[in-house]
């Protein structure tokens, strides 16, 4: 059973949200990435980088500054947040009707090295990490298979190959990874017989035909500032957690990027626009969509100011017993999100590699027609932790 979230961790959660929105903005600033659909788990990346921070020495301050409040901060806050996230936010309550969640951290270290006992204890106890010795030097392909199989198992087959071909060789010394699986049923499922084909307007001004889910039931919708926000709660288990998907729909058909900019520059934006009550709906349409998205995150993290871990100046000496320097060469992240009448299925994995409610008020009918590009996120509302975030520019594109 998930426990109550510690109050002193809530500020760290605000920092995690800030990191999530900055990273989302960095992804969208790349024209090639921005043109398609995007889905990723900032929580997965945050936990992976926090684990690196736990093993860093002189490099630690820069990591904490990016992951925390933008100042020097304290690595202990990141460890405390990770522990609360693993034990509270990502606890599995599917047996009592809540979302099915699986989350795992893994540390794969070359047989020529050994983890420092203090780091291994912290990783196992606070991050619930699995540690495993592998032979990158002599059995590279076998080691890659072990990492990929581990991710595939945790994500129940949604993510089969987190490590791209050629990404690991005999100079690889360490892989830190995590994998996340989320499957939630809507609190109010959509009637499949109401799903109809209609037009979705693309950013270039053209239109496509796609499947839209529809409903006449009351919905959580807020309207303000040329923006509508839809909250779709997932069915709950017996604990206090409440997961929800949020659809942020700009008023203008081409308003996605201006909305994205506001989201990244105003950390309180999400909280200020969360619908607080249900309303009667008029025309209500939400497209079904499926997104598979993968990217290498080191260049994005550098753009955010995280330079040292990826350079020869990296100091990860609190992680392994070795006289040889260790730096992070790659951070691979892959996500999958599917939204349909039943609910949402989502998965994410990150690997970092080292190389040497109130009563509803009576209101007018509110339309919510998501027939043009929009942002979405999946959040645990009690803690305020953003688990997945992304945007849909074309619901017909799945990869």
Curated annotation (Swiss-Prot):
Which residues of this protein are annotated with the site description Reactive bond?
Answer: 357-358
Tissues where the protein occurs: Highly expressed in embryo and endosperm. Is accumulated and stored in the endosperm, where it exists in a free and a bound form. Expressed in roots, coleoptiles, shoots and leaves.
What conditions trigger expression of this protein?
Answer: Its expression is regulated by the 'high lysine' alleles Lys1 and Lys3a.
> Which parts of this chain are annotated as the region RCL?
343-367
GO cellular component assignments: extracellular space
- Gene Ontology molecular function terms on file: nutrient reservoir activity; serine-type endopeptidase inhibitor activity
What InterPro entries is this protein classified in? Answer: Serpin_CS, Serpin_dom, Serpin_fam, Serpin_sf, Serpin_sf_1, Serpin_sf_2
**Residues annotated as region Signal for targeting protein Z4 into the ER lumen?**
36-56
The domain of life for this entry's organism is Eukaryota
Which Pfam families does the entry link to?
Serpin
What biological processes does GO assign it?
Answer: defense response
- Keywords in alphabetical order: Plant defense, Protease inhibitor, Seed storage protein, Serine protease inhibitor, Storage protein
**Does this entry carry the keyword DNA-binding?**
no
**What is the protein's known function?**
A major component of the endosperm albumin, this protein acts as a storage protein during grain filling, contributing a substantial part of the grain's lysine. May have an inhibitory function during filling or germination. Inhibits cathepsin G in vitro.
Q: Which PANTHER family match?
A: GH10112P-RELATED, SERINE PROTEASE INHIBITOR, SERPIN
According to the UniProt entry, the note on domains is: The reactive center loop (RCL) extends out from the body of the protein and directs binding to the target protease. The protease cleaves the serpin at the reactive site within the RCL, establishing a covalent linkage between the carboxyl group of the serpin reactive site and the serine hydroxyl of the protease. The resulting inactive serpin-protease complex is highly stable.
The UniProt similarity line reads:
Belongs to the serpin family.
The name this protein goes by in its record? Serpin-Z4
Protein species of origin? Hordeum vulgare
């Amino acid at each position: 059973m998930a426990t109550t979230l510690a109050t002193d961790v809530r500020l760290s959660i605000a920092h995690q949200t800030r990191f999530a929105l900055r990273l989302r903005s960095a992804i969208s600033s790349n024209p090639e990435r921005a043109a398609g659909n995007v889905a990723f788990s900032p929580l997965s990346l945050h936990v992976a980088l926090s684990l690196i921070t736990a093993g860093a020495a002189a490099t630690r301050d820069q990591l904490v500054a990016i992951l925390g409040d933008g100042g020097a901060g304290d690595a202990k806050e990141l460890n405390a947040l990770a522990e609360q996230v693993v034990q509270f936010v990502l606890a599995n309550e599917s047996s009592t009707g809540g979302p099915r969640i699986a989350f795992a951290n893994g540390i794969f270290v070359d047989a020529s090295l050994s983890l420092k006992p203090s780091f291994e204890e912290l990783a196992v106890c606070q991050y619930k990490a699995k540690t495993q010795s592998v032979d990158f030097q002599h059995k590279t392909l076998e080691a890659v298979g072990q990492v990929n199989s581990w991710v595939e198992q945790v994500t129940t087959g949604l993510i089969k190959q987190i490590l791209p071909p050629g990404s690991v060789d005999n100079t690889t010394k360490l892989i830190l990874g995590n994998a996340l699986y989320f499957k939630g049923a809507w609190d109010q499922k959509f009637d499949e017989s109401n799903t109809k084909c209609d037009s979705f307007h693309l950013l270039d001004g053209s239109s496509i035909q796609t499947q839209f889910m529809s409903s006449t039931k009351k919905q959580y919708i807020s309207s303000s500032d040329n923006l509508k926000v839809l909250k779709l709660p997932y069915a709950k288990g017996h604990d206090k957690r409440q997961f929800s998907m949020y659809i942020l729909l700009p008023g203008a058909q081409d308003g996605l990027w201006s909305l994205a900019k506001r989201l990244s520059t105003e950390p309180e934006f999400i909280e200020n626009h969360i619908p607080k009550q249900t309303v009667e709906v008029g025309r209500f349409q939400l497209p079904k969509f499926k997104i598979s998205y993968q990217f290498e995150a080191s260049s994005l993290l550098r753009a955010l100011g995280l330079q040292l871990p990826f350079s020869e100046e990296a100091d990860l000496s609190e992680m392994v017993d070795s006289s040889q320097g260790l730096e992070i060469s790659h951070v691979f992240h892959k996500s999958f999100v599917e939204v349909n009448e039943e609910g949402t299925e989502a998965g994410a994995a990150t690997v970092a590699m080292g190389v040497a409610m109130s009563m509803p008020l009576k209101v007018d009918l509110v339309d919510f027609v998501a027939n043009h590009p929009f942002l979405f996120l999946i959040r645990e509302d009690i803690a305020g932790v953003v688990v997945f975030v992304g945007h849909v520019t074309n619901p017909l594109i799945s990869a």
